[in-house]
Amino acid sequence: VDDSLVRGTTAHKIVKMLYDAGTKEVHLRIASPEIKYPDFYGVDMPTKKELLAANKSVSEICKFVSAKSLKFLSIDGLYKAMGFEKRNSTYPQLTDHYFTGEYPVKIIDELGDRKVTQLSLLSTGSNN
């Protein structure tokens, strides 16, 4: 069991260590949905190209980490675990855009081919 699978490198190393220690089979369970989308709001995350679940199917990820089986928590399961009956698709109760790709505001430059500019919400003027 792991909390998330981002690039897959840690899971791959842990699974290898388990096999090297004599484990016969490894069945990996991830306690989050697949992370398929990057964060553009300040969380230091890999790009979409680097996110394993954005580029591979669950069976391909399973082979990559050398596990016998692999399962992720579903979006519905995440919301139920957090005490919600279901996800509000219009106004999600959780920050879940890493899993759904539904960002709170429209992302204009998803390809990253333009220079990113950070705008401050804090005024630096003396009129505060």
Please name every model-derived segment:
Residues 1-128:
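PRPP-associated nucleotide enzymes
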